[in-house]
UniProtKB/Swiss-Prot annotation:
Pathway: Glycan degradation; xylan degradation. Residues 402-578 form the NodB homology domain. It comes from the Bacteria. Keywords: Carbohydrate metabolism, Glycosidase, Hydrolase, Multifunctional enzyme, Polysaccharide degradation, Secreted, Signal, Xylan degradation. It is found in: Secreted. This is Bifunctional xylanase/deacetylase. It comes from Pseudobutyrivibrio xylanivorans. The lineage of its organism: Bacteria, Bacillati, Bacillota, Clostridia, Lachnospirales. Residues 1-14 form the signal peptide.
Amino acid sequence: MSATLLVPSMTVKAADTIYNNKTGNQDGYDYELWKDTGNTSMTLNAGGTFDCSWSNINNALFRKGKKFDSTQTYQQIGNITFDYGCDYRPNGNSYLCVYGWTVDPLVEYYIVDSWGTWRPPGGTPKGQIQVDGGTYDVYETTRYNAPSIQGDTTFKQYFSVRTSKRTSGTISVSEHFKAWERMGMRCGNFMKPALNIEGYQSSGSASVYKNNMTIGGSSSSSGNQGGNQGGNTGNENAGNNLVTVADADKIQCETMTKSGQYTGNISSPFNGVALYANNDAVKYTQYFASGTHDFTLRGCSNNNKMARVDLKIGGQNKGTFYYGDSYPAEYTIKNVSHGTGNQTIELVVTADDGQWDAYLDYFNNSVEPGCSLVPGAVVVLVALGSSSNTGNNSGTNTQNQKLIALTFDDGPSSTTSQVLDMLEKYNVKATFFLIGQNVNSNTASIVQRQVKMGCELACHSYTHEDMTKMNASQIRNQIDWTASAIKNTAGVDVKFFRPPYISVNNTMYQNIDLPFIQGSMHNDWESSTSASQRVNSVLSSAKDGDIILLHDFQGNSQTVSALPQIIEGLKNQGYTFVTVSELFEMKGVNPNVEYKIWSNVK
């Protein structure tokens, strides 16, 4: 999303007051008053602010926020925050919260900062999270055949309820969604988040004197409320407007230096730059204090043909951004090694065949300490992420070692426990590619044992279906749900992905932000392959840097029986066993290569 103010200039006029059910849009905010019975009033003040009162009601709500069309996840929309202040005076049961819905799955959610006589929703929390400098209890409930945005149906309710009340501050909606997903609570496509006052069989009043909704920009992952508010000081005078992230957080491509015969500005599907032909380019200058970074570009093709934009730093090609259709998306080239000091950075088209154009929107602006604009430079290319040197770690102590990585697919299961027994006996680590739906309360102890033993956990999809038959949203869900299940169970992040059936296509490459891993295969999923055949297959084909693909699905006893001879045989051949992460690190190889699936690292 381009950093564009969504609200037109306003003419000051007397505030409207409504008394009955009504929805509409005012000053860029979507508003709603809803009640089933009783007396209500809602005065629509400027921007996101409003006053409301209620009495003799069964249920009533008053809110201002933003409606979305339910086609994008919160990750695609960007970070959403509410900076609010409210004089809140409930008499009885009431909430002050951010409220909304997601679809696919259908979820009604509440982020509650204050309440009346009853603290919602009752019951036992799933756990606690730290967001915006406060602690929230998290709850998940199910409503059966209840009213929803899709009629009477069954759906989930998610609650984050602050442990201590407050009536002003920042609510970082996206951070709650991230925390919920880490706890295994799936979130779907976004609809109408809003700052909400709700009453139930009660009376009261509220004056929302501040309500700034921000879309896009940097995440408040630190949970520091002060950091959020401080980051918005540039918009203090926009307190009554719906705003997107400040310009300082985005670098718009149309402001950059252009070169080439046809390079030019565009206004659709965003305000940006079009590269129409080979050698069309935009150039940048950046000072780097360290030599490894991630680079992210938002863009798209002008049609359904694959557009390619090369990234050059210091005249050297560092990778390519790929855009497979006309839907704008962010793509990242990770762990790029480059020179330090002043560097010329170029985004350039070199593979144009006359069938597509490349549209460029923006770079995220998150410059690290030690990086700065060069005097006179037109623009900075953003350097995201850490400055680790994992891409250059090969040293004399490892370069002559023969390394091999054992990996196992389709767990966790009871067979996984038997595999772990063998690995523990021989003091060997492995990488396990887990199926997300198999990670549950019955297998949690197995997953935790894997981590305790120093093994690595990776993603093998959530349902183990052929993902080449899925759309982009379904593909991302498979990854996100699995990562959340693993994070919630074992507290670790996944770093690699192995596609089910080793079946891949461009849509998968474009929507999965993890390195793809294959490996050498030994037919150990076939019950007709004997234990000795599995041993011989592995030992006869092993090479330095290999990733060996085996399976720990329920009942795969032949692989368990083969493991002692496989491990002993590889040790006799001089191999050291490492995880997949260690294999890349010790070989000094960057795994983040677009459109590549790895079986050997060298």
